[in-house]
Amino acid sequence: MVYSYTEKKRIRKDFGKRPQVLDVPYLLSIQLDSFQKFIEQDPEGQYGLEAAFRSVFPIQSYSGNSELQYVSYRLGEPVFDVQECQIRGVTYSAPLRVKLRLVIYEREAPEGTVKDIKEQEVYMGEIPLMTDNGTFVINGTERVIVSQLHRSPGVFFDSDKGKTHSSGKVLYNARIIPYRGSWLDFEFDPKDNLFVRIDRRRKLPATIILRALNYTTEQILDLFFEKVIFEIRDNKLQMELVPERLRGETASFDIEANGKVYVEKGRRITARHIRQLEKDDVKLIEVPVEYIAGKVVAKDYIDESTGELICAANMELSLDLLAKLSQSGHKRIETLFTNDLDHGPYISETLRVDPTNDRLSALVEIYRMMRPGEPPTREAAESLFENLFFSEDRYDLSAVGRMKFNRSLLREEIEGSGILSKDDIIDVMKKLIDIRNGKGEVDDIDHLGNRRIRSVGEMAENQFRVGLVRVERAVKERLSLGDLDTLMPQDMINAKPISAAVKEFFGSSQLSQFMDQNNPLSEITHKRRISALGPGGLTRERAGFEVRDVHPTHYGRVCPIETPEGPNIGLINSLSVYAQTNEYGFLETPYRKVTDGVVTDEIHYLSAIEEGNYVIAQANSNLDEEGHFVEDLVTCRSKGESSLFSRDQVDYMDVSTQQVVSVGASLIPFLEHDDANRALMGANMQRQAVPTLRADKPLVGTGMERAVAVDSGVTAVAKRGGVVQYVDASRIVIKVNEDEMYPGEAGIDIYNLTKYTRSNQNTCINQMPCVSLGEPVERGDVLADGPSTDLGELALGQNMRVAFMPWNGYNFEDSILVSERVVQEDRFTTIHIQELACVSRDTKLGPEEITADIPNVGEAALSKLDESGIVYIGAEVTGGDILVGKVTPKGETQLTPEEKLLRAIFGEKASDVKDSSLRVPNGVSGTVIDVQVFTRDGVEKDKRALEIEEMQLKQAKKDLSEELQILEAGLFSRIRAVLVAGGVEAEKLDKLPRDRWLELGLTDEEKQNQLEQLAEQYDELKHEFEKKLEAKRRKITQGDDLSPGVLKIVKVYLAVKRRIQPGDKMAGRHGNKGVISKINPIEDMPYDENGTPVDIVLNPLGVPSRMNIGQILETHLGMAAKGIGDKINAMLKQQQEVAKLREFIQRAYDLGADVRQKVDLSTFSDEEVMRLAENLRKGMPIATPVFDGAKEAEIKELLKLGDLPTSGQIRLYDGRTGEQFERPVTVGYMYMLKLNHLVDDKMHARSTGSYSLVTQQPLGGKAQFGGQRFGEMEVWALEAYGAAYTLQEMLTVKSDDVNGRTKMYKNIVDGNHQMEPGMPESFNVLLKEIRSLGINIELEDE
C-alpha cells in the first residue's frame, strides 16, 4: 500500500485478513445527497422544489379566464455565512425567487385566446440551507433532520393472526396506502363477508365500492367466480364437467358417462379418478335434479314472453325455480362455482348483506359514511367519491407506491398512474380472496422491502408543498376578484404561509433535532440515525415487539446493535456502514458478484426485495488465490435463513466483515467476543465521551477511526495537494501543486481553523494544526485535528494502564479506583464552555439599562466589571459573581404631580430601579473567554460594544490583508517566473519594486499575454480585497435584528476546566461502565517488578457475568502494543542506528498470519523512519477489524516481540505494604472514556429557595434549585427508628408548614432553638380535594 507523507507519520498495524474490496463510503452522504436532490434544478420535475412547483402550478381561476404559471426558480446567496449565523442566532438560509407568468385569456373569444401575459420574479420566503457537514443552523443552533423509516406506499395484505375474534379465526385484510390521500382497507369479518373501510372509518360491504364504480351484480359475479353450467335435455339435468373442480369432494351420486361408472356414490374423489375422467375426455355428466338445489344463479333470467324476472343474479336455486326456468324456455343455466376448500362464496355472500342496488345508492352510502349528518345530493356524492381515489390533486400513490402495488399484484410493468383505476381495486380484492382461499401469502410489514426511508430532502419537499397548497387557495381567490389588468404576479403571492410551513418543519418537527455534538462520533451517528417515530410514523406506546425486533432483512442495512435502551429500543436505529438508499428510498447493501463459482470484485447493491431471491455467502468464507471457495459447503443466507449450500449454488458474497454493523459498533475492537447487550451499551456510550484536553489515539482500534474523524468534518482536510507555506494556531496556508491548479488562479488555499468554540453540549471545539512548515500534503490529508482527533484518527478517550483485581472494596459493584497520577497528568481533564446571556428589554415602566451603577452592591462585586457594566475577558469568576450589571425600573407607586415635578427638576432617584444583573449560576466557576454585545438598530451602542466592534474590524482587516499578502506572494512568484522565462534578468528584477514588474514589456508574445493575464488577476485580487473588507465592515457595524422588545443582548462565554473526580462516570468500549470511587495516591497503587504503578484498578467480577470478553483481549493486545512502543523508545534513547530501528519496526508490522496490510519500510527514507519511530514511542497503534480481528496466537506473538509474558499476567506488589499479591494479575492497556455524566453537573444542595404554589413544598431538581424529597420510604425508615421529633420536623417546618417555617427562621435569628410545628399546607390541600368530592371535613379545636 502507498502511504502519503502525512500518513507515514503513524501507521496503524492492521490484523485484518480479508481483502478490502470496497472502501468505506462517505458517511454523511445520506443527508447531503438527499438535500442536494431537493434544491438542485431537476429538468424531469421528479424531485425537490421543481416537483413541488409543478404539482401545484399552473393555478387557474374558478372562471378559467386567467391562470398563474410557473416558469423557474433560483436560490439566492445567503446573507451570513454559517459561523456568523451561529454567533448572531439567525437561520442559515437562502432567499427563494420564483419566476411566475400571469396569463389572462379573452373572455368572449374562443378557448385559449391570450389577452395579456405578465412575467415577474416573486420572492417566496427563505429556504434553510444545509452546511457542508449535513446540519442546519436554525436560530443560531445546529440541528439535524433525522431520516424516517415509514411504511412504504403500496398495497399490503395482512391478517390479524386470530386475535380479533374470540373463536381464534384468522381474518385477512388488504390495505392500499397512498403517498398522500385516503387509505382504502378491505377486510373479512368472522362470517366471511368482505367489507371496505375508507380512512379507517366505519365499514361498508365491499361490493358497495364496486357498485360505485358502476358494476352491476351480474358483472360483479362474473369478475369473481367461475361458472358451472347446467343444461336441461329431455327432462334430464346435465352438467358441463371440469374434472379438476371435483378434487377432494365426496360423490353424492354415481358419476358415470358413456355407461361407465367412474366414481360410486359416497366415495371420495381422488386424483386417480380425475386423471381417468380427463383421459376419457368426459365433458358432460348427468346429475340428479336435487343436485342443483342451493346453487347460486350467475345472472338474471327473464321470462321472454311476459318480461317478468324469474330469478335475479345471486339468488339460490330451488326445484320450483328450476321448473319455472324450464317452462319459460331457459334450457342453459349458469351457476357460480364455489366449494369449501379453495373457492369460497365470499363476494356472493357479501352482496346479500349489501343494502344498495345501483350506483347512486352506493355513492350516497359512501357519502353518509364519510360526512355523517350532511344531506347527500347526487353531485356532492359523485364528486366526493371521485376525489377520494381518482383525482391527482387529492390522491397520489407516487412512483414507489405504484411500483410496490404492481409488484404485489405480480404485474409486468412497474410504472403507471399515481391514482387508482377500477382494475387496481378489483385486482386487490381478487388477491385478498385468493389469500383467504389459501393461495398466496400475507406480507411481512417489518420486512425492509415494505419500509422505506424518508430523508431530509423528501420531508422538506412535502412541507414546502403544504405551504404552496395554502398559497394556492389564496391565489385562486385573487384571480377571481377581477381587475387583473393592474395586478402583477407578486400581488397574488403571499410568501408567509410557505416560509411558515418550512420554518415549522425545521424548527419544531419531531424529526428536526438539536444536534448531539459531544464528539465527532456522536455527530456522525446522529446524522445516520433512522427513526420509526415522527409524523406519519409509529408512536412509542403503540409499537409492539415485532417492529422493534431485529429482522433478517436488517443485514447490512440497519445495525442490529446500536439502538437506545429504554422506551425507544428498536424504534431508533442506525444505518450500517455500507448501506445506502436507492431511487425509491429502500435501503440497499453491496455484495460481490459470484460468477461460475468465482468471487469477482464486481459490486452490486441489492435492496431487501431483490436479496430474497439469491444465495449469499458470508464475508469470512475462505477463498483461494483465484477467488474460488475453499470448502465444498459454504455458510450462506437465503430467504432470511442461514444454512449450508454447495459452493456452486452461491450467487453473491458479502463485501466486508463489518458490513452488518453501524459506524459506532464498528469502532469496538473484538466486538465478536462481546455479548450483544453489552456491545449495545458500548456503542451508545462512545457517543457520550467528552473530548479530553489532549486527544490520545486508541492503541487498539479497528481501522475505522480515520474514516470517522475525516468524514465527521471536525478536522481540516486538504482540498488539494501542495506544500505547507505558512502555519500558525489559527490558519494554515497551502501552496497548491501546479497540476491541481485551475488556469488563472493564485494557487493558494487558506484554511482558517475554529478556535475554542462552544458545542451544543457545552464541550469545547478547537482545531490544532498537525502539519509543519514545508511539508508536502496530498488531497484528503488531515491538516488540523479537531476535538477528539489525534493525527486524523478518532480519539475519544485515553489509553490507561489497568489491572483487574479487587482493591479494598473500592471497586465493588463496578466502581473504579483511579491513581492520582491520572489527575496530575490531566489525562481526563476536559474543557466546557458555557454561554450566559443577559437580555435588556423595553418594559412598560421604561427601558432596562446595562450599567455598572447598581443599587446596594459593594465595590468588591463590581471589581470585575468595566465602566459599561460588562465583565472583562480573562476574569476568573465563581458562583454568584456579577457578569453583566443591569437595572430594571421599578414602578411600585403612582407618583403625585408634585413628585413628578421634583423628579423632572432634580433628576431620577436611585431607589426606583431594582438590580436584575446576570450572575454566575451556583456551583459554576471559570474564566471569561469571550463577550459579545448585540444592539438593536437605532439604539446607541455603549463603549464596550464599540470596543468589540473595533477589535473585530481590526481582526478582519488583519486576516484579509494577510490573506491578500499570501495570495500576492503566490501571484508575484508566478509573475517572476514568466518574466525570467521571457528574458528579464533575475538580479534586475529583484532591484525593482514589485508593483513595477507588471509594467515591463516582453518580446515573446505568448509570455506577454501571460503577463497581462497575471496583471489582470492582480487588479482583480485587490478589487476583491476591497469588496470583502467593505462587506465585513458593513456586517460588523450594522445593528442586529433582535426580537421585539429587546434592546440589547450581552453574551458571556465561560470556560470551565473539569478535572476527573470521584463520582464521575467512566467506561470502556465494551459496555463496561462504572463510577470513580476514589482517587488513590500514586504510592498506594499496586506496582509491578519494574516499579511501574497501574493507573486504574477494575473489578474482575464485572467480566464473567456480563460476557464482554473483548475488554480482556483488548487489555492484552494493548499491553503488547505498549511493549513494542517501550522497546522502540529504549532504542531511540540509546540512539541506535536507523537500520536496527527499521528492522525491528518492520518485524512488528510483518507479524501475524496472512495479514492484508503490507508495510515496506525499505521504501521509507531514514528521516521518515525516525519520525515514525518517534510517533510509535508511546505504543504501536493496532487495528483489529470487527469479525476479522487478531487471533489469540497473534496476540501472544506480539507480546513475545515486546518481551512480555504471553499469559498477559504479571506479579504485582501492594503499594502500601510492598508485599506481593498472591497470584499474577491481568495488567494491560485499555482505552477508557470519560462520559458526559459529570458529578459537578449533578451535585446540588439547597438551603432556602422557591416553593411550589399549591402545596407550598420546595421544588425538586437542580434546575429549579429544589430540595431533596423526603418520600414515603424515608418516612418509614424514621418511623422504624422511632425518631418521632425528627420526623415531625421533616414533615412540617422543613417542608410545607408556612407559619412554622417563618417562626423557625425568627427563632434561629433570636438564638432561641425551639420549633413550633403547625398545620402542613399539603393537609389543607387534601381537605380541599375531599370537599370537591362533596364531603365537608372541618377540624375542631378541643
UniProtKB/Swiss-Prot annotation:
Taxonomic superkingdom: Bacteria
Gene3D superfamilies given in the database record: 2.40.50.100, 2.40.50.150, 3.90.1100.10, 6.10.140.1670, DNA-directed RNA polymerase, beta subunit, external 1 domain, DNA-directed RNA polymerase, subunit 2, domain 6, RNA polymerase alpha subunit dimerisation domain, RNA polymerase Rpb2, domain 2
Annotated positions of the N6-acetyllysine modification: 1022, 1200
Any one GO molecular-function label of the UniProt entry: DNA binding
GO CC terms of this entry: DNA-directed RNA polymerase complex
Subunit structure: The RNAP catalytic core consists of 2 alpha, 1 beta, 1 beta' and 1 omega subunit. When a sigma factor is associated with the core the holoenzyme is formed, which can initiate transcription.
Protein name as annotated: DNA-directed RNA polymerase subunit beta
The species this protein was found in: Escherichia coli O6:K15:H31 (strain 536 / UPEC)
Gene: rpoB
